A protein has these predicted regions:
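Positively charged, aromatic-accented nucleic-acid-binding surfaces
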Residues: 1-42, 46-47, 51, 79-138
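Key DNA-contact positions within bacterial/archaeal DNA-binding proteins
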Residues: 52, 56
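Residues in the recognition helix of alpha-helical DNA-binding motifs
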Residues: 57, 61
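Short Lys/Arg-enriched helix C-cap and helix-to-coil transition segments
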Residues: 66-82
Length: 138
């Protein structure tokens, strides 16, 4: 899993989002603040597949009626080169990313599915409220 940071690409400041990436210990980490949404290039890096394979699976998902229209797209990201706007890259929501992971057969996709299942099975923290009755001044 080779990660390449392209300094020519900038993320729009108005579009605050998170994305998934890998640590050196082959663990999924969430980076950024906001809802998870990823571009095709980020998805190819995370799932360790070629763009062609990823694009084919994405097109299949988008054409199927299994996803609600709101789950299919998470907006667009501005693409800049030499400080000039060159175009837009579609962003895919977490729902689409999870569905896509079940259509890919890479080791990274398998580990991502395990991570998602682990997070779902992990019990949520329970906060016990404490109510103070009567005079609370000491």
């Amino acid at each position: 899993m080779k990660t390449i940071n392209n300094p020519k690409r900038k993320i729009s400041v108005t579009n605050q989002r998170s994305y998934c990436d890998w640590t050196d210990g082959i663990q999924v980490v969430r980076k950024g603040n906001g809802e998870i949404a990823m571009t095709e290039s980020e998805l190819t890096r995370v799932f360790g597949v070629t763009w062609r394979k990823l694009n084919h699976r994405l097109q299949t998902l988008m054409k199927s009626l299994n996803l609600h229209p709101d789950e299919r797209s998470a907006g667009e990201e501005d693409i800049y080169a030499n400080e000039q706007l060159k175009g837009y890259a579609p962003l895919y929501s977490l729902t689409t990313i999870i569905a896509l992971s079940f259509q890919l057969d890479s080791t990274e996709a398998h580990l991502f599915r395990e991570y998602i299942c682990e997070r779902l099975l992990k019990p949520a923290s329970v906060i016990t409220p404490i109510f103070l009755l009567g005079n609370t001044n000491n």
